[in-house]
């Protein structure tokens, strides 16, 4: 079972609804954050042009997948080239900046990195978030740019080329011998925007509650049925407080989606570790039908998650088997953010589940006789400590969902 002491290691350290306005109440962006925003929303940085980062990380849905036509089925998004799809659902681009470099903690758990499988380790740039930003542009299943030079040349032609050199210095936008360095600066700029208060405003109903509790000397991470009365009249409704209590106790959600504060800020609801919670295959995943040069296994392909990445790293190969099927614990912030009440979001790394209620039901009843969930995609390394048969009632499941809805930022 994971321990909350993992927080100690954490302290180290797109079609999109383009008309949607983000961060109206946030502080003005700094020059590097503004540069990162322009890069994030630039449709010229794909081949063919037309796909920006926001195509998969839309602000109207918590900076994750904004297109219902994909969410309703595979949950995986089409790249710049029609018919090409990746293999996993877009993770949230917000509230990710505190993730440390991928490493083993004292308990032998992998912590940190970016992407569902942790492959943006942070070893190259010292920043997993920036390393993640370097991936999609050159991925033939995503933005499909042919090389770094093409990306830099596109930025040179952009309306924000001058801003780039104001931020990084004269002649910094170099597509010649320093193209690798320039590409790193592009990624670091995007990471700066993704860390900005516009993307991470901490403005939800829960945040107001958390600050009110802190002002009274109360620690939200300690809430249980016996102490719940102390947290009343601080901004959450009675049902939402009940959901929080269940989230932190019987539901065992907070073991991984931790309530502990990091760097004095409200919690981001992840411990940045990896788990195999037994998610079944998503039969609608379009990656199964991709060309053999992208998916030689076809429908037999299995998502090995972290273990699959560790197999490719010499120093970690011996640990790959123990991490097969594990995927990164995502933030829960803005899991209930959508442009309309009937909007369908996809959940889990492969988009297999389509509602928060289904997610909670899965955690609660995965191993319960008669529940009839499909078999896990990867049966080894299954987490049975915090999921499978929690004994939650239907009302208790609903209360946890109601609590998660308080994590939506006001924009």
What are these regions (language model features)?
Residues 8-17:
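Bacterial N-terminal signal peptides
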């Amino acid at each position: 079972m994971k321990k909350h002491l993992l927080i100690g290691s954490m302290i180290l350290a797109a079609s999109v609804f383009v008309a949607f306005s983000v961060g109206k109440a946030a502080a003005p962006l700094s020059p590097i954050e503004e540069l990162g925003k322009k890069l994030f929303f630039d449709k010229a940085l794909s081949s063919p042009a037309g796909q920006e980062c926001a195509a998969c990380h839309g602000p109207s849905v918590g900076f994750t997948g904004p297109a219902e036509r994909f969410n309703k089925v595979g949950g995986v998004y089409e790249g710049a080239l029609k018919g090409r799809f990746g293999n996993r659902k877009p993770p949230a681009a917000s509230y990710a900046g505190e993730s440390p470099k991928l490493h083993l903690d004292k308990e032998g758990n992998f912590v940190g990195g970016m992407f569902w499988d942790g492959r943006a380790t942070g070893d190259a740039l010292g920043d997993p978030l920036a390393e993640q930003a370097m991936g999609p542009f050159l991925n033939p299943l995503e933005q499909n740019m042919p090389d770094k030079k093409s990306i830099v040349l596109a930025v040179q032609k952009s309306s924000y080329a001058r801003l780039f050199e104001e931020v990084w210095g004269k002649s910094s936008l170099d597509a010649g011998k320093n193209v690798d360095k320039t590409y790193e600066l592009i990624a670091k700029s995007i990471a700066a925007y993704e860390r900005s208060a516009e993307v991470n405003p901490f403005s939800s109903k829960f945040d107001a509650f958390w600050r009110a509790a802190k002002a009274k000397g109360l620690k939200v991470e300690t809430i249980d049925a016996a102490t719940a009365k102390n947290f009343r009249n601080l901004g959450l409704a009675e049902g939402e407080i009940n959901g929080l209590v269940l989230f932190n106790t019987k539901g065992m959600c907070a073991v991984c989606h931790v309530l502990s504060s990091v760097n004095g800020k409200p919690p981001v609801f992840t411990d940045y570790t990896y788990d195999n919670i037994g998610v079944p295959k998503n039969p609608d995943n379009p990656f199964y039908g991709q060309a053999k040069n992208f998916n030689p296994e076809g429908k037999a392909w299995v998502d090995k998650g972290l273990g699959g990445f560790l197999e490719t790293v010499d120093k970690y190969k011996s640990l790959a088997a123990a991490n097969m099927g594990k995927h990164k614990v995502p933030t829960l912030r803005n899991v209930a953010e959508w442009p309309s009440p009937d909007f369908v979001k996809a959940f889990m790394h492969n988009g297999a589940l389509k509602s928060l209620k289904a997610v909670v039901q899965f955690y609660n009843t995965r191993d319960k006789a008669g529940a009839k969930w499909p078999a896990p995609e990867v049966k080894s390394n299954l987490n049975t400590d915090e999921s499978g048969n929690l004994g939650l009632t239907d009302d208790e499941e609903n209360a946890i969902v109601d609590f998660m809805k308080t994590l939506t930022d006001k924009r």
